[in-house]
């Protein structure tokens, strides 16, 4: 009976294919003579049978059924034969094709047509770290050692190396079976923001235990001649995922077996592995910076032109590390933009130094990880208010001119780690920045220190009464007097129990409230004016001055008032065109009354509404139409009477209408009145007495 050589126990009928015809010419290796089976024969299907001619029981324990491989090699795939997980597989070893044994290429799915072929491989060389024959004596079963030599997997190898991707409590959330790392290895790949990887030909053993395996670790070569490696920290097992966390060019990116995850493509395995990295520390609260769930601090290489002490690395023990910002070491390094040879200083949220300095002593070590987080850059994380943030040189706020003494570099970072304030080019932003700088010096405490006397409301009410009698006709004066008389008893009742200290406190409340309103007026683009309960202007916006032509200094009584426009006709008597100086007999300047800014009918209507809101609805408001009087001197009134000016103003309306500040200034040029709508309300003080009249003005809709 003729026997066949080189056939497996369960060889399918394709043994006579073209691939096997080529291997027949090659023959078996010299050091592995062909085996014969005297007790077995081959049937027509190529299956071995016992000598009695009966087919063996497939469930016989002495003949276990071969497990189907996750991916067949190229030769077995082409011959449609059962392959194994190991590389080279047993069939290729028997045929002498161990050097050419590699994973076969499957047909890509439609959604993976754009993916590169290399990314669809389950692992480099199809390594399976969970297989018993995958690793032997530190040499991968693929037959390729890290130093470049090709080896053949020995069938007698019994020692294996496995990776626990799913961590157990005994592994302390570690990705590996941990031992102190005291070995080095490199990969010939480099990332633009990562250390330079160099190729070492003699990897050192991981430890001296009997079951030692020659695994490999990552080392970094520095730009300077000297090289530094990973620190031999005794607590390295406490820090999984050390080193550069996300470096696409690093071959040891995730350090777990992708082929063992039973994924058809590399994309899915990487995504699942990334989620596993994040989940391993999701429930932890890093207290010493040793690990952060998905990234550790130790294990990375140092980056300094001169190592401190010669052995200062990133593998520090927990007691030597500072508590990171929110337990995250990357948050301390957002604005880092230094080169690899430049020392970097991290500033934590809570300074730990007892000498009063902002920077703890151990933070001055130039050991920052030389990598940026995803989508981060040197200048992408400049906080708004960088000029007022705690800087490196002092523990308090620095002045704005302190940046003039700092020598900065082209990348926007200064020598001592400070950042230049962001450049503002937009005019509106420049104005806003200047306003912020001005408001920074304003202190509300000055309000309480400056007010020493109560405000003379009685004398100002007398001045208002005299002005009303001088300007308005007797009929309209009577209407205004009736409105004020209706609220006079309420004023007397609320003020009769107030002493001098109460009146001073009332004025302090007024000034403090006005201090807040000034910021609102500057930020709001609506014409706004704020008056006391006597009607005196206390604050005004720039837009109101543009609309009416009244200067802010004139309204506040800081400049003389030469206005002669009272809203009457040209035939008015002489008292209506007599200018009233803001400096009266007392010699003190006084603000303009609100009644001087409105025409006669609007003033009467205003005081009638004021009598209703003064002690009525505290949240009520009035919205109505009015006519504001433009600020006009005697020369302006004479010029407005000429026909040429009137014709020119009519032509202006027909051509371009109202536009910009110049167009607003032309409003009311002919008759000296600006018809508009306004909304105003009354704000009361702590004694429930009317304190402020806040008025917003806008042009009516056409």
UniProtKB/Swiss-Prot annotation:
Start and end residues of each stretch annotated as Disordered: 1-66, 159-246, 281-320, 565-586
Any one GO CC term of the record: nucleus
Molecular function GO labels: DNA-binding transcription factor activity; DNA-binding transcription factor activity, RNA polymerase II-specific; RNA polymerase II transcription regulatory region sequence-specific DNA binding; zinc ion binding
Compartment list: Nucleus
Biased composition, class Polar residues, residue ranges: 34-55, 165-200, 218-240, 297-320, 565-585
Family: Belongs to the ERT1/acuK family.
Name used for this protein in its record: Transcription activator of gluconeogenesis acuK
Organism: Emericella nidulans (strain FGSC A4 / ATCC 38163 / CBS 112.46 / NRRL 194 / M139) (Aspergillus nidulans)
Biological classification of the source: Eukaryota, Fungi, Dikarya, Ascomycota, Pezizomycotina
């Amino acid at each position: 009976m003729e026997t066949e050589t080189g056939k497996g126990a369960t060889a399918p009928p394709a043994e006579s294919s073209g691939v096997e015809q080529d291997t027949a010419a090659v023959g078996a290796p010299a050091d592995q003579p062909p085996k014969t089976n005297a007790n077995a024969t081959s049937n027509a299907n190529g299956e071995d049978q016992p000598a009695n001619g009966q087919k063996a029981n497939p469930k016989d324990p002495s003949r276990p059924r071969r497990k189907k491989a996750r991916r067949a090699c190229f030769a077995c795939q082409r011959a449609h034969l059962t392959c194994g997980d190991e590389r080279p597989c047993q069939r290729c070893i028997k045929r002498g094709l161990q050097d050419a044994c590699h994973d076969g290429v499957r047909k890509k799915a439609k959604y993976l047509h754009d993916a590169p072929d290399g990314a669809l491989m389950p692992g480099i060389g199809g390594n399976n770290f969970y297989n018993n024959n995958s690793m032997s004596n530190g040499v991968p079963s693929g037959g390729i050692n890290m130093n470049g030599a090709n080896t053949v997997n020995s069938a007698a190898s019994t020692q294996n190396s496995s990776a626990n991707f799913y961590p157990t409590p005994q592994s302390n959330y570690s990705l590996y079976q941990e031992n102190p790392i005291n070995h080095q290895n490199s990969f010939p790949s480099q990332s633009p923001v990562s250390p330079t990887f160099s190729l070492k030909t003699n990897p050192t053993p991981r430890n001296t235990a009997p079951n030692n395996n020659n695994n490999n670790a990552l080392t970094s070569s520095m730009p300077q001649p000297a090289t530094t490696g990973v620190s031999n920290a005794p607590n390295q097992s406490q820090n999984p995922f050390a080193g550069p966390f996300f470096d696409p060019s690093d071959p040891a990116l995730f350090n777990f077996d992708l082929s063992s995850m039973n994924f058809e493509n590399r994309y899915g395995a990487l995504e699942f592995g990334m989620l596993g990295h994040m989940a391993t520390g999701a429930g932890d609260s890093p207290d010493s910076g040793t690990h952060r769930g998905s990234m550790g601090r130790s294990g990375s290489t140092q980056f300094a032109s001169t190592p401190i002490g010669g052995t200062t690395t990133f593998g520090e023990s927990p007691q030597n590390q500072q508590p990171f910002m929110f337990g995250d070491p990357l948050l301390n390094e957002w604005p880092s933009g230094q080169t690899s040879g430049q020392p970097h200083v991290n500033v934590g949220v809570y300074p730990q130094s007892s000498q009063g300095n902002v920077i703890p002593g151990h933070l001055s070590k130039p050991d920052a990880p030389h990598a940026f987080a995803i989508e981060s850059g040197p200048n992408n994380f400049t906080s708004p208010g960088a000029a007022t943030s705690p800087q490196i040189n002092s523990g308090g706020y620095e002045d704005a001119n302190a940046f003039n003494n700092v020598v900065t570099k082209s990348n926007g970072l200064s020598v001592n780690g400070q950042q230049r304030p962001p450049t503002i080019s937009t005019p509106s932003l420049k104005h806003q920045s200047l306003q912020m700088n001005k408001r920074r010096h304003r202190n509300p405490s000055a309000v309480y220190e400056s007010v020493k006397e109560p405000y003379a409301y009685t004398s100002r009410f007398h001045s208002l009464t005299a002005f009303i009698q001088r300007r308005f006709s007797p009929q309209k004066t009577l209407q205004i007097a009736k409105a004020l008389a209706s609220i006079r008893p309420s004023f007397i009742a609320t003020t009769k129990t107030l002493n001098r200290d109460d009146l001073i406190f009332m004025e302090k409340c007024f000034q403090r409230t006005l201090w807040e309103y000034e910021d609102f007026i500057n930020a709001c683009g609506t014409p706004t004016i704020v008056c006391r309960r006597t009607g005196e202007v206390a604050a005004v916006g720039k837009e109101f001055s543009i609309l009416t032509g009244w200067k802010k200094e004139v309204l506040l009584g800081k400049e003389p008032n030469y206005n002669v426009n009272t809203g009457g006709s040209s035939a008015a008597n002489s008292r209506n065109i007599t200018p009233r100086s803001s400096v009266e007999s007392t010699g003190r300047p006084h603000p303009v009354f609100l009644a001087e800014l409105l025409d006669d009918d609007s003033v009467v209507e205003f005081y009638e509404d004021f009598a209703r809101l003064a002690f009525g609805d505290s949240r009520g408001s009035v919205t109505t139409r009015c006519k504001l009087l433009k600020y006009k001197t005697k020369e302006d009134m004479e010029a407005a009477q000429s026909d040429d000016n009137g014709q020119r103003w009519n032509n202006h309306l027909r051509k371009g209408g109202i536009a910009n500040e110049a167009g607003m200034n032309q409003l009311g040029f002919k008759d000296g009145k600006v018809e508009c709508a306004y909304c105003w309300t009354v704000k009361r003080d702590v004694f429930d007495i009317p304190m402020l009249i806040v008025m917003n003005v806008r042009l009516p809709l056409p």
